[in-house]
């Protein structure tokens, strides 16, 4: 069974939950002079990421950077484990998320309170990342991917107060994390178009900030979204 598919411009979509590539969380690999992973999912997705890298003949040692749009566990819970396996990689995250990736104790405690007996199955292990391997990214920062290609980062709050998006200069696509909503390709509106619902996470949902993030994304000369 394949856990990835090539989308465009050497961007691969990775299944972060085995067997649910089209209907569940996704991560992305940008393959090129620099190999970049965007989103890690929770640690149980680790084996499918490594399997995909092996199939594509990319060594974990060849991963240059791992980017998380925000630190919610379905997007970044497996970052510590994957960083151990990608020894050359730098982890990129918004400044407000840095301390929780270097010391995830609060993330673990909060998840255990919510998921209780299901915590181990869904998220274990959540491992700390050495501070020296974490680089913070803020509004307007860029990452050179080589060959004239770059990612530009923007703060996009509303779902979380540390959420960023990345705009790819080559594909003209936005890696949107959760701020563009939850995409349902099997649910359609009256015109037959797929529907995306706002992702209103508890505690940090801010409708005004989310609307501002929508305006930001609409202002970019984008051709597609990578949910």
Predicted features, each with a name:
Residues 2-56, 166-176:
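Conserved beta-strand hairpin/beta-sheet module of binuclear metal-dependent hydrolase folds
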């Amino acid at each position: 069974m394949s856990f990835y598919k090539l989308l465009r411009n050497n961007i691969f979509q990775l299944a972060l939950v085995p067997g649910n590539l089209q209907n569940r969380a996704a991560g992305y690999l940008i393959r090129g002079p620099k190999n970049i992973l965007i989103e890690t999912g929770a640690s149980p997705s680790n084996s499918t990421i490594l399997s995909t890298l092996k199939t594509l003949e990319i060594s974990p040692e060849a991963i240059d950077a791992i980017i998380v749009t925000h630190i919610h566990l379905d997007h970044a819970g497996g970052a510590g484990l994957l960083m151990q396996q990608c020894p050359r990689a730098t982890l990129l995250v918004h400044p407000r998320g840095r301390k929780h990736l270097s010391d995830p104790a609060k993330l673990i405690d909060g998840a255990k309170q919510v998921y209780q007996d299901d915590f181990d199955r869904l998220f274990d292990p959540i491992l700390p990342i050495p501070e020296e391997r974490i680089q913070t990214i803020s509004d307007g920062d860029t990452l050179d991917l080589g060959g004239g290609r770059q990612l530009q980062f923007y703060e996009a709050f509303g779902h979380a107060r540390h959420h960023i998006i990345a705009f790819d200069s080559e594909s003209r696509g936005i890696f949107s994390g959760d701020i563009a909503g939850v995409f349902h390709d099997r649910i359609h509106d009256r015109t037959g178009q797929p529907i995306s619902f706002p992702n209103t996470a508890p505690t940090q949902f801010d409708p005004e900030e989310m609307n501002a993030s929508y305006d930001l994304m609409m202002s970019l000369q984008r051709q597609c979204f990578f949910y």
